[in-house]
Amino acid sequence: MSRRSISRKPRVLVDTTFLLPALGVEVEEDALKAIALFRKLEIYYLEVGVLEAMWKVLKAIPPEHLEVVKVGLNSIRNTYNTLDIPAEAYTEAYRIYNEGHKDYIDTLYYSTAKTTGTPWLTIDEEFIEFLKQHNYKIEGIIYTPEDLKSIIR
């Protein structure tokens, strides 16, 4: 269920990387700098991104720190908005996966951003290059942290 917002802030779908710090998992400096700008954006996430984040938590967070994870999960859910993945996005993600990018979650993020018109913030340069090489549209669909300052009013 999405939180409704009457703000006119730019909408952005965030990659799993940007959920990880709330769960106690370290990320790249570029991601942390982008997160500092989130208050100026209307942030969306995918539930599959939370699942992907939990796979990283299983590897990085010891059991005695699970309370941090729980607080972080609640924070994500209470602060950001969920974005439902349209059926069309699932099938487009399948096609992209079959073209050679073997991370289905990445392909879901991209296809959801494209289908819903909610740009996707990612630091995954390898996937961006894959999309370019396969003639997928990037402009207006994918943002990198460097792009954020130009879209914030």
Where are the predicted features?
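Short, well-structured N-terminal submotif of metal-dependent ribonuclease cores
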Residues: 1-45, 60-71, 149-150
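Short, surface-exposed amphipathic charged segments that create phosphate/polyanion-binding patches used
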Residues: 97-100, 151-153
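PIN-domain endoribonuclease scaffold, especially VapC-family toxins
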Residues: 32-99, 107-115
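Anionic group-transfer/hydrolysis microenvironments
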Residues: 17, 23, 49, 54, ...
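Short, flexible helix/strand-to-coil boundary loops that buttress conserved ligand/catalytic motifs
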Residues: 23-24, 57, 97, 131-132
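Acidic, PIN/NYN-like endoribonuclease modules and their adjacent C-terminal/linker elements
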Residues: 1-9, 115-153
